[in-house]
């Protein structure tokens, strides 16, 4: 089996507004392997540290065991959905301050009630540029 090689260009590191000197950390929860790899590369190239998981349960564990600055989650995943993950984040005293971006292939009108607790909603297919813009906007709002 051929190994996958990903080359990431050198870039400026984005420093966490919460903890100066530490790269901003994005928790990425996405069950689609190809999309997850694409977003990992996009985020790393933009200077973010990425903790990447394939389902909501792993995301919950990662959120509790890492210094996360923002959560990007798919709405529909195995084991624990993005909606349940968002509720978990909002109800956890140590995590409730984190911005959450929900990704979904469903139309926004179909998922509005479930995505209400998310800070932003992006429809799939999501471009790297729109995700980075959304992250930057939410982090700027959080630090002001």
Whereabouts are the PLM-identified features?
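Active-site residues of response regulator receiver
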Residues: 74
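Receiver (REC) domain active-site loop signature in two-component systems and cognate sites
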Residues: 77, 89
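Non-catalytic signal-transmission and effector/linker regions of two-component phosphorelay proteins
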Residues: 1-25, 129-144
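Charged docking surfaces used in two-component/phosphorelay signaling
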Residues: 37-45
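Conserved acidic carboxylate
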Residues: 30
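Short hydrophobic/Thr-rich beta-strand motif most characteristic of the beta2 strand and flanking loop
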Residues: 47-54, 62
């Amino acid at each position: 089996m051929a190994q996958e090689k990903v080359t990431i260009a050198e870039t400026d590191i984005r420093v966490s507004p919460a903890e100066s000197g530490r790269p901003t950390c994005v928790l990425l929860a996405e069950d689609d392997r190809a999309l997850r790899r694409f977003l990992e590369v996009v985020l790393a190239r933009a200077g973010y540290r990425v903790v990447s998981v394939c389902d909501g349960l792993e995301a919950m564990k990662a959120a509790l065991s890492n210094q996360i600055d923002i959560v990007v989650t798919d709405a529909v995943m195995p084991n624990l959905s993005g909606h349940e993950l968002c509720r978990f984040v909002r109800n956890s005293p140590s995590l409730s301050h984190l911005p959450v971006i929900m990704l979904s292939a469903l139309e926004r009108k179909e998922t509005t009630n479930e995505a209400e607790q998310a800070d932003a909603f992006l429809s799939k297919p999501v471009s790297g540029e729109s995700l980075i813009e959304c992250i930057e906007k939410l982090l700027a709002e959080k630090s002001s």
